[in-house]
From Swiss-Prot:
This is Free fatty acid receptor 1. G-protein coupled receptor for medium and long chain saturated and unsaturated fatty acids that plays an important role in glucose homeostasis. Fatty acid binding increases glucose-stimulated insulin secretion, and may also enhance the secretion of glucagon-like peptide 1 (GLP-1). May also play a role in bone homeostasis; receptor signaling activates pathways that inhibit osteoclast differentiation. Ligand binding leads to a conformation change that triggers signaling via G-proteins that activate phospholipase C, leading to an increase of the intracellular calcium concentration. Residues 32-41, 102-121, 201-223, 280-300 are cytoplasmic. The gene is FFAR1. Its main location: membrane. It comes from Macaca fascicularis. Belongs to the G-protein coupled receptor 1 family.
Length: 300
């Protein structure tokens, strides 16, 4: 069942109204910390903040589109630009959360060995690789398989379809035969792989916390911090990617689910700054790393 256009519009507007100031504050806070001491976590937080800010800027147009029942309100030539601005940060955010998770897991489980590779320059390289992977894969899908692409035999502009009602639609009226595999490939590489990495790393972090000397209260706080990124991936970006899997398995499924998933994905711009901001201030996992490092040093 589709959400009413007015409700979809209100949810997009609310996500923009909350997400824009939160991400601006998150980026400013990360920059302030970076001036004192740049760490890999700050590099990932800065990239995640910029990614979410780009996604946030695209939400007003998504709100207008929802209010118009999916009709594209701008010139057709701007559809590919909007597609990259909206979907690239939606996928890149999962990669940055996975990288942040991996860094914290390595710091908690292997504190001495990780220190040798804990360099911001390596983290910048990881972020550049994530951006390149997302943009290249997304660009190939758009150019080859989107409406108006090389493998599409229509004469429409790239990304634009015109259903029977005559209103142009941007990226939401693909032929199911080509849309299903294309979207599934994006979800498999750019969501489910980062999700698996994040889940594995945070289970490892929780095991490290269980064997640490922290108080019960600080263990609970650190455990909540550890689950924040995983919870964001599952609650915000998970429904959209689940709809991609459903439409791949059955082209008749996933339409309404996809619209709801795009809305929950938009709300990642609200939760991500809260998660990364809390991670940046929380002492839990850093204390675990310090305790384990001191313990390993004393044993020597």
């Amino acid at each position: 069942m589709d959400l009413p256009p007015q409700l979809s519009f209100a949810l997009y507007v609310a996500a923009f109204a909350l997400g824009f100031p939160l991400n601006v504050l998150a980026i400013r806070g990360a920059r302030a910390h970076a001036r004192r001491r740049l760490t890999p976590s700050l590099v990932y937080a800065l990239n995640l903040g910029c990614s979410d800010l780009l996604l946030t800027v695209s939400l007003p147009l998504k709100a207008v589109e929802a209010l118009a029942s999916g009709a594209w309100p701008l010139p057709a030539s701007l559809c590919p630009v909007f597609g990259v601005a909206h979907f690239a940060p939606l996928y890149a955010g999962g990669g940055f959360l996975a990288a942040l998770s991996a860094g914290r897991y390595l710091g908690a489980a292997f504190p001495l060995g990780y220190q040798a590779f804990r360099r911001p320059c390596y983290s910048w390289g990881v972020c550049a690789a994530i951006w390149a992977l997302v943009l290249c894969h997304l660009g190939l899908v758009f150019v080859l398989e989107a409406p108006g692409g090389w493998l599409d035999h229509s004469n429409t502009s790239l990304g634009i379809n015109t259903p029977v009602n005559g209103s142009p639609v941007c990226l939401e009226a693909w032929d199911p035969a080509s849309a299903g595999p294309a979207r599934f490939s994006l979800s498999l590489l750019l969501f489910f792989l980062p999700l698996a990495i994040t889940a594995f790393c945070y289970v490892g972090c929780l095991r490290a916390l269980a064997h640490s000397g922290l108080t019960h209260r600080r263990k609970l706080r650190a455990a909540w911090v550890a689950g924040g990124a995983l919870l964001t991936l599952l609650l915000c970006v998970g429904p959209y990617n689940a709809s991609n899997v459903a439409s791949f398995l059955n082209p008749n499924l996933g339409g309404s689910w996809r619209k709801l998933g795009l809305i929950t994905g938009a709300w990642s711009v609200v939760l991500n700054p809260l998660v990364t901001g809390y991670l940046g201030r929380g002492p839990g996992l850093k204390t675990v790393c310090a305790a384990r490092t001191q313990g390993s040093t004393s044993q020597k």
